[in-house]
Amino acid sequence: MTAGSDLDDFRGLLAKAFDERVVAWTAEAEAQERFPRQLIEHLGVCGVFDAKWATDARPDVGKLVELAFALGQLASAGIGVGVSLHDSAIAILRRFGKSDYLRDICDQAIRGAAVLCIGASEESGGSDLQIVETEIRSRDGGFEVRGVKKFVSLSPIADHIMVVARSVDHDPTSRHGNVAVVAVPAAQVSVQTPYRKVGAGPLDTAAVCIDTWVPADALVARAGTGLAAISWGLAHERMSIAGQIAASCQRAIGITLARMMSRRQFGQTLFEHQALRLRMADLQARVDLLRYALHGIAEQGRLELRTAAAVKVTAARLGEEVISECMHIFGGAGYLVDETTLGKWWRDMKLARVGGGTDEVLWELVAAGMTPDHDGYAAVVGASKA
């Protein structure tokens, strides 16, 4: 749990770091649909990642949430998710990277001198990382890594990729399990042409073809522990996404509320129409609850896989509803890309329900942790039969 003064200092640091340059880089990135590497470099130079991580192997959840709020205020899913992916790769290295080689990569990433990304999903299985086809095998005192990753965000600008692969040392014909994670220099892979996407334009995402050798020190998580390592990174990303959604929803509600108070229809402002006013009040109440939940999780001081899954899927579904309703209240203007940014926000928000784990994958994690009340059931059923 973060001490109050320390968290206040971090908020102050974020306020200084997220300056007019960050706003300008974000606007340019949205126009060009390219992620600005200088943004991560800037956050590193400003000490944002260093202050967030300090010397800890595990993240300060309070600072994780505050950084997510700052990213969400930019109202750019491409920028927010890109920074959080870099930071989530740091999370993997901080906890699982034990060699001096990996510690050096992590330190560079914290300083903003290196950009990190994660290569997990493939055409074969999407979120099912047990069946990844990228293979890792021992060779010449290191590891040979071969495979194709389909969705690798930030790969066009990254220096290192945290690659999820299966070890086939025990059985070259295996097709399941023995998942490992290895750090692969981006200079040693072939990054394909970035995809054209529905939204999140600045989040450069491309397929990556891997056929290379890396030293033994590049192994982040040995065979059999890779799922634990990537799950840890995903939990970090999911918490960040939830915080970004909370902040971006609040911004959308505030802008829509201003529209409602200035726009007149049928002799009244839109806000004076009860149906619209109460609809917004409902959304505001639920966004408030999301923000309170994030602060509550931060107070516990622990990053938990199921909690991160639960808050991310809940936030993503709420975010989609909030942006859709705000766009609706803007009427025809909300549908015009040259008049408002509501359409862009609407397209961006869809990514939240897919990236970092789909709704169904996250609900399965929540379901696995549910506890039945057998005694309570017996008492209720017994009472009804009495």
From Swiss-Prot:
Signal peptide range in chain numbering? none
Q: Which InterPro entries match?
A: Acyl-CoA_dehydrogenase, Acyl-CoA_Oxase/DH_mid-dom, Acyl-CoA_Oxase/DH_mid-dom_sf, AcylCo_DH-like_C, AcylCo_DH/oxidase_C, AcylCoA_DH/ox_N, AcylCoA_DH/ox_N_sf, AcylCoA_DH/oxidase_NM_dom_sf
> In which pathway is this protein known to take part?
Siderophore biosynthesis; mycobactin biosynthesis
Q: Which GO terms describe its molecular function?
A: acyl-CoA dehydrogenase activity; enoyl-[acyl-carrier-protein] reductase (NADPH) activity; flavin adenine dinucleotide binding
Task: Read off the PANTHER family from this record.
Answer: LONG-CHAIN SPECIFIC ACYL-COA DEHYDROGENASE, MITOCHONDRIAL, MEDIUM-CHAIN SPECIFIC ACYL-COA DEHYDROGENASE, MITOCHONDRIAL-RELATED
Give me the gene this protein comes from.
Answer: mbtN
Q: What does this protein do?
A: Catalyzes the dehydrogenation at the alpha-beta position of ACP-bound acyl chains. This results in the introduction of a double bond in the lipidic chain, which is further transferred to the epsilon-amino group of lysine residue in the mycobactin core by MbtK.
GO biological-process terms attached to the record: catechol-containing siderophore biosynthetic process; fatty acid beta-oxidation using acyl-CoA dehydrogenase
Q: Name one GO cellular component term.
A: cytoplasm
The alphabetized UniProt keywords are: FAD, Flavoprotein, Oxidoreductase
Entry's family note: Belongs to the acyl-CoA dehydrogenase family.
On induction, the UniProt comment says:
Induced by iron starvation conditions. Transcriptionally repressed by IdeR and iron.
**Keyword Flavoprotein, does the record have it?**
yes
Q: Which cofactor does it need?
A: FAD
* UniProt protein name: Acyl-[acyl-carrier-protein] dehydrogenase MbtN
EC number(s) per entry: 1.3.99.-
Q: Which organism is it from?
A: Mycobacterium tuberculosis (strain ATCC 25618 / H37Rv)
